Regions:
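Bacterial N-terminal signal peptides that target proteins for export
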Residues: 1-5
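Bacterial N-terminal signal peptides
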Residues: 7-16
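Beta-strand-rich N-terminal accessory domains
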Residues: 21-91
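Acidic/polar, glycine-enriched structural segments that form the non-catalytic walls/loops
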Residues: 21-27, 31-32, 40, 126-129, ...
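Non-catalytic C-terminal accessory modules of carbohydrate-active enzymes
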Residues: 59-61, 68-72, 79-86, 91-138, ...
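Aromatic-rich carbohydrate-recognition surfaces in CAZymes
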Residues: 86-96, 162, 295-317, 374, ...
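Extended glycan-interaction surfaces of carbohydrate-active proteins
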Residues: 334-382, 419-456, 501-525, 565-659, ...
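Active-site core of glycosidic bond-cleaving carbohydrate-active enzymes
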Residues: 389-420, 462-464, 471, 475, ...
Length: 740
């Protein structure tokens, strides 16, 4: 009965238009399928499941199924030529044509790719398409759905329209290869029809190169679904080209296809799905520690569940799509948000699926582990291949926190463990916050794979940990006592560690060269960056202490703030902005991140570390110099400017724009009523990343004037754009959302 109801619901969708997601929003990024330049696309898959990407030129690549695979140059995005979409068209009176749906065959002017993640669309409306086709791609990346966000599945909803005056036969085929396979099987369950490309062997998988794929669709009285396997793609094309159907035969092949076929009357539109799912239960680090992927908690670990996953997708995709559509439209329909923000918020979410994301469901190689804990982490970038990087996730965790807060809390607990723990399945605590929780070689098994600098004496990490703990506790209702209890001892140790870094007795941590997230930038003495973060953390720690009933300690934190804050003012305030530091070669330099602590406290509903008047003056100084005089305000905010309005070129990082810290500046501006300035910064970054720089789906950490020397593609920090959303939500009442 459930399937009958869902089938009727889906059938009537063509008339009622319940699939609002089939309408491409104006905020979606778009590009001709045949356009020259960098090619990539929105991924499918789930957290920790590995991902598959259908690029904007119509090519598929599968390399990220091996979690952690990637490099700075993007060479891993090479296409698998056995994985393709095809379209068959035949008029009632006339010959059939078959199009391979990629740029090499179509060229320009035939199709347009669009993305507003988690949706992507391709609209085939050129002269080669008498039957017009539009496909909507998505995975169930549903906020606060901690089950389906793990699923290794993608949905391709094909909408075919016959605008001609005669009947047309139309068919869509997806060909695929299982790089780990040995044979194929036909599978059917009522109207659900599919092909499984089986894993090699019959035993339970023990390697990340053991698993299977499923291609499936939905048959009906008017829709015929066929499938087959073959020795090569050419054989599948030949069979499909004959009549738009496949032979329903399988053998010992690793390549196969599924196709649906329908006859369209003049003016008729239909919507038919193709599902792509996989089951590769194990992932492993370079040092061969193995982990079960999170989705296996909801199926099993046998590596034979791709058909079960596909069936669930066929049954529930209408519900998934509705929930995703409501999420997207709460953003796109919000009149408080500028248009650039609507696009950036969603499209920058790709990083959680393409950045080597682990989400484990237990150790698979005998290592000590709590299988119910579900550790989660992703890379800082491919060139800096550290997991979790705490100083960066301070900015780059806002999207995760705002959509899946329980996952973010687990990430923070891992860093709390780096300070203090008495667990047998963790490395010993360091007495200070770790930079990371391992690299691609040894994720989850060590602290501080980063050795470029000695991060154990950095001046920002401990303050950032306390602020993230407070954020995740306070902004989720201040009710999660288990989370606070788990992190509290580490917070106290972290606060004392920073207090010991005050060398001159003014209550502020003293920098001694390179000792914070800007790890090629010398800072000396009191600094607006680290000092401001410490002031912010004192106010957060006070609130945590009060929640724990430690009133004397709360008073201590307040007293430390009251003592240090006037020194922050007297040492760093120039009358217009806060100096970068007190002891470098030029303390009067203008650092864009000087009010990072102010922004965070405003975001958390805490008192500011400086007056609003001083904050506004400082942000205006940053806007006038670090933004407006950096490429004439065309591509973000440069890290450091000289007081005379020239770019500070004393280090590589002073003369860079960092995308993520630029978002922190914009968020701080919004919190202080400077929306016009934030809007200019945001628009410049949208244009840079998704237009002139061609950085789509690989947003870098940094670039220099005129977009020279981009660095660290696929970078973690850029999802700080969600902090800008949080800022708008804080200063404007939320509008009432009514589903269409």
């Amino acid at each position: 009965l459930r399937r009958v109801i869902l089938f009727l619901l889906i059938s009537t969708a063509f008339i009622t238009g319940i699939y609002a997601s089939s309408t491409i929003p104006t905020q979606a990024w778009s590009r001709d399928v045949g356009a020259s330049g960098y090619t990539d696309g929105a991924p499918i898959g789930g957290f920790g499941a590995g991902t598959i990407t259908w690029k904007n030129n119509g090519d598929f690549y599968l390399s990220r199924l091996d979690i952690g695979t990637g490099d700075e140059a993007g060479s891993f995005t090479a296409a698998n030529t056995n994985c393709k979409f095809f379209m068959y068209q035949k008029p009632a009176s006339g010959a059939a044509t078959v199009q391979r749906l990629d740029s090499a065959n179509l060229g320009t002017g035939q199709a347009v790719y669009n993305s507003l993640f988690p949706f992507a669309w391709v609209n085939y409306s050129g002269s080669r398409f008498s039957v017009k086709a539009k496909v909507t791609q998505y995975s169930p990346i549903i906020p606060e759905d901690y089950q389906r966000v793990s699923y290794p599945v993608g949905v391709y909803e094909w909408e075919l329209t016959n605008p001609t005056t005669q009947n047309y036969d139309a068919a869509i085929m997806l060909t695929w290869e299982n790089p780990y396979g040995s044979s194929a099987s036909l599978v059917t369950d009522g109207n659900y029809t599919g092909l499984v490309l089986n894993k090699a062997g019959t035993g339970t998988p023990t390697l990340e190169t053991q698993g299977e794929f499923c291609l499936a669709s939905l048959s009906s009285a008017n829709v015929t679904v066929t499938r087959m396997s073959a020795a090569n793609r050419a054989a599948l094309e030949t069979d499909f080209s004959t009549d738009g159907a496949l032979s329903n035969t399988v053998g010992s092949n690793t390549i196969g296809a599924v196709a649906f076929k329908v006859t369209l009357a003049p003016g008729q539109t239909v919507r038919i799905p193709i599902i792509l799912s996989w089951d590769i239960p194990i992932t492993q680090s370079q040092y061969n520690a193995k982990w079960y992927r999170k989705y296996t908690q909801h199926f099993n670990r046998l590596g034979t569940n791709s058909w079960a996953i596909a069936r669930e997708a066929l049954a529930d995709r209408a519900v998934w799509e509705q929930k995703l559509d409501e999420w997207v439209h709460r953003i796109t329909d919000n009149p408080n948000y500028p248009e650039w923000l609507k696009s950036m918020l969603l499209n920058e979410m790709y990083i959680y699926f393409t950045a080597g994301t682990y989400w484990e469901a237990g150790g698979a190689s005998g290592q000590a582990d709590n299988p119910a804990e579900n550790m989660f982490s992703h890379l800082e970038s491919y060139i800096y291949d550290f997991y979790g990087t705490s100083d960066v996730r301070f900015y780059g965790s806002w999207a995760l926190f705002m959509n899946w807060p329980e996952i973010d809390k687990q990430c923070i607990k891992q860093f709390a463990d780096s300070v203090y723990n008495n667990r047998s399945d963790r490395p010993a605590g360091l007495g200070t916050t770790a930079h990371d929780i391992g690299s691609r070689a040894d994720v989850f098994t060590r602290w501080n794979a980063y050795v470029y600098r000695d991060s154990t004496n950095w001046k920002d990490l401990n303050s950032k940990l306390v602020l993230m703990v407070y954020r995740d506790w306070h902004l989720t209702g201040r009710t999660d006592s288990d989370f606070l209890d788990y992190c509290w001892q580490s917070c106290k140790i972290a606060m004392e560690k920073t207090a010991t870094q005050d060398a001159d007795g003014d209550g502020l941590p003293d920098s001694n060269g390179i000792d914070q997230t800007y790890d090629d930038m010398d800072l000396t003495g009191d600094t607006s960056y680290c000092g401001g973060l410490y002031l912010a953390s004192l106010l957060a720690a006070k609130e945590l202490a009060l929640a724990k009933g430690e009133t004397a300690l709360a008073q201590t934190y307040q007293e430390r703030f009251d003592f240090a804050q006037p020194n922050f003012e007297s040492q760093l305030w120039t009358g217009q902005y806060y100096k970068i530091d007190t002891g470098s070669h030029d303390p009067t330099r203008i650092m864009s991140d000087q009010l990072c602590g102010q922004w965070y406290n405003k975001a958390l509903g805490l008192p500011g570390i400086v007056s609003d008047a001083n904050a506004v003056s400082s942000f205006q100084k940053i806007y006038d110099n670090n933004f407006a005089k950096f490429g004439n305000g065309s591509h973000g905010v440069v890290n450091v400017m000289n007081a005379n309005g020239t770019i500070d070129s004393t280090s590589s990082q002073t003369e860079e724009c960092w995308v993520g810290t630029s978002w922190g500046v914009a968020a701080g501006m919004v919190h202080h009523g400077m929306e016009a300035q934030a809007d200019d910064i945001g628009q410049s970054l949208l244009n840079t990343i998704w237009n002139t720089g061609q950085y789509w789906f690989r947003t870098p950490e940094a670039f220099r004037i005129n977009l020279t020397m981009p660095r660290a593609m696929y970078y973690m920090r850029a999802t700080a754009v969600w902090a800008v959303k949080h800022a708008y939500d804080s200063v404007h009442p939320a509008p009432t959302y009514t589903p269409s």
